Amino acid sequence: MTHLNKKQRLENNHNNTVNNHFEDLHDDLIISILRKLATSASSPSDFLTVLSTCKRLNRLGLHPLVLSKAGTQTLAVTAEKWSDSSHKFLKLCVNAGNIDASYSLGMIRFYCLQNPVSGASLMAKAAIKSHAPALYSLSVIQFNGSGGSKTDKNLRAGVALCARSAYLGHVDALRELGHCLQDGYGVPRDVSEGRRLLIQANARELACSLRSYLSLKSGDENETLTDLSVVPVQEIHPVNRFLKEWFSSGRVDLAEGLRMCSHGGCGRPETRAHEFRRCSVCGKVNYCSRGCQALDWRAKHKVECTPLDLWVAAAAEIGDDGEAVAVEIDDNHGER
């Protein structure tokens, strides 16, 4: 019995020593470590799990100096796990001056929580600090008059915001600006400059894909650059993934007559009927922007698109026996 008591005393002394070592660490050092964790965490749980370890880590982990550095993946709350606690966490990050949090929470409030005024205000807060995705999202809102009526469209403001985002390197904004210049949409028409911007956007997108490819295959000598099937597609921003999950999960239903943007990497819904543009060829798909339309055309719609007049012709060519006869079509329509 004496031996057991002595062993227990040694274990208790060891635990106390470990605890004392942690308590001896200065708050500034722990905050510095937590800032690096918040920046590099691959998911919210990676960061929040550490905060649940003890009261001191929880207190220091919610320090504004830590939350202001929370990275995009740390803020990547999913629609499935959305709750008052996750909403509160994002608000704490916003109050700490985190511009990624301002953008993400702004998008969620604008499109998911039916609070367009607060959502636009948060996105504007991020845009003022030159946050490229926030600038682009605000430009889409201005182009469509989202959250208001059709008369609330402001094409000149949309072009200005889009140009600023493109200048900061946002590929979707660069592509959108190129289409605006080509079509003279909200800006004097300049076909050659618009074409140049579209080529530049495609080049940047290809460069990003190749960098990702090379980083994935740098240690595999059997793979070559000719194996384009493994070149990764453009990564979807976590907040766009949130929007997709929010409306596709059945958690909430869109109001009657409202539609989602058909581009798989977007997730934006209409805020009023007939807000988004339709494909002028088939009329079956809808897009919040020319950029989304161009990306979806290249990814899948080019194969799926069938002219409306084909269906009319097919209906007219149904014979008396109920069987359809062959109808020739012209498949040379371009990107719409």
Curated annotation (Swiss-Prot):
Species name: Arabidopsis thaliana
GO MF annotations, alphabetized: zinc ion binding
UniProt keyword Metal-binding present: yes
Binding site for Zn(2+) 1: 263, 266, 288, 292
Lineage, opening ranks: Eukaryota, Viridiplantae, Streptophyta, Embryophyta, Tracheophyta
Stretches annotated zinc finger (MYND-type): 263-305
Pfam families per record: Sel1, TPR_27, zf-MYND
Domain F-box: from-to ranges: 19-70
Record's signal peptide: none
Binding site for Zn(2+) 2: 279, 282, 301, 305
Keywords, comma-separated and alphabetical: Metal-binding, Zinc, Zinc-finger
Protein name: F-box protein At5g50450
InterPro entries cross-referenced by the UniProt entry: At2g35280_TPR_dom (IPR057136), At5g50450/At1g67340-like (IPR044508), Sel1-like (IPR006597), TPR-like_helical_dom_sf (IPR011990), Znf_MYND (IPR002893)
